[in-house]
A protein has these predicted regions:
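Secretory targeting signatures
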Residues: 1-46, 87, 156, 203, ...
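Beta-sheet-rich sandwich/jelly-roll-like modules and their strand-loop junctions
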Residues: 31-112, 146-153, 159-210
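Short beta-strand and strand-turn-strand segments in soluble, beta-rich domains
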Residues: 113-123, 247-258
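Short proline/glycine- and polar residue-rich coil/turn motifs
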Residues: 122-135, 260-268
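Enriched for extracellular/lumenal, surface-exposed ectodomains of secreted and cell-surface proteins
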Residues: 160-162, 186, 244, 261, ...
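Asparagine-centered strand-capping/turn motif at beta-strand->loop junctions
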Residues: 228-232
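Intrinsically disordered, low-complexity Pro/Gly/Ser/Thr-rich segments with frequent PxxP/GP/PP motifs
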Residues: 250-280
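Terminal connector regions
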Residues: 275-312
Length: 312
């Protein structure tokens, strides 16, 4: 803790005087929990982390350093999975805290948010004074999943409202244990940042590897079938399909949707649309997506003759 605090105190003095900007068929369907509070059809995996506690810093506006400052903190990291699902920080809050803690994901420290989420004070343990490690908790920041590029640097920016005595505690380490990133601090609401190469926050990121699907449409009598096959190396989670028939004169069967919780590598789904009845030239469209698969689609021109569908 002494290492972390001494490092930051020196940095706060520097920050006060400088303004440097750091510019099927699949039979293994199941439901599972992604974390303690949010139900999800898939289990994400730990990607990046630093969990070696050394001390805590106030996050927000307080006079912990002998003068009032609104401290915002950013942790850089380099993901190894293509999908980023959530992150955690080891944190607590002061008894007077009344505004949410906000986390934003960025690929540029002062750029646009790729994802953002607020967590209310009631989700944090309350402490009086500087917390011990046992008084802290891993807080989930469960934003909407985003695609990232493995090997590229991203930033987890954590802040709260600039209101006196509205502050949280966030844990870290002053010995640069995490090799793929570092801590940045701001005392002007994120306008300018100073980097501390010998410090890291206590954090975890979670994600999934991208996988790939192959799709095909097979028209026939009374109904149309389609095949979704996992041709990638990882399980596809929360697979959803949307089949539509557009054009022509369709009495029954314009839209069919479906979902399964997982499709393992090499596995395939053989699904049918149900009864299609109509006449005329139509377009058959199939869109498929999954939690860790970018949306793909296929279209086929066809003729519907009552209950028979033929691709043309």
């Amino acid at each position: 803790m002494k290492k972390l605090l001494s490092c930051i105190i020196i940095g706060m003095v520097v920050l006060g005087g400088l303004g440097a900007v750091v510019t099927a068929t699949n039979r293994n369907q199941k439901n599972s929990q992604r974390n303690d509070t949010t139900s999800s059809p898939y289990v994400d995996e730990l990607d990046q982390s630093m969990t070696d506690y050394d001390g805590s810093l106030p996050l927000g506006r307080t006079n912990i350093f002998g003068f009032y400052a609104n401290l915002s903190i950013a942790q850089s990291f380099i993901p190894q999975k293509e999908l980023l699902t959530r992150t955690q920080f080891l944190m607590a809050r002061n008894a007077s805290t009344s505004y949410p803690c906000v986390l934003a994901v960025r690929d540029n420290l002062t750029g646009e948010n790729l994802a953002i989420i607020s967590v209310g004070p009631n989700e944090f343990p309350v402490v009086n004074g500087t917390p011990t490690e046992d008084q802290l908790a891993w807080i989930n920041f469960n934003f909407n999943d985003i695609w990232v590029i493995p090997g590229q640097t991203y930033y987890l920016v954590v802040y709260t409202a600039n209101i006196t005595e509205n502050y949280y505690w966030i844990a870290g380490n002053g010995t640069n244990i995490y090799p793929n990133g570092t801590v940045m601090l701001s005392i002007d609401d994120g306008k300018t940042w100073s980097e501390f190469t010998n410090a890291d926050g206590c954090f975890k990121t979670y994600g999934l590897h991208e996988t790939f699907l192959e799709i095909a449409i097979k028209p026939g009598l009374f109904k149309t079938t389609f095949v979704i096959k996992n041709i990638g190396n990882y399980t596809a989670w929360d697979v959803t399909w949307n089949f539509t028939v557009s054009g022509g004169f369709i009495l029954l069967g314009r839209n069919f949707i479906g979902n399964i919780s997982e499709l393992t590598p090499g596995g395939e789904i053989i699904a049918s649309t149900g009864f299609i009845l109509g006449l005329g030239k139509v377009t058959l469209s199939l869109k498929v997506s999954a939690a860790n698969v970018k949306e793909l689609s296929i279209q086929k021109d066809a003729i519907v003759l009552l209950f028979f569908v033929k691709i043309i």
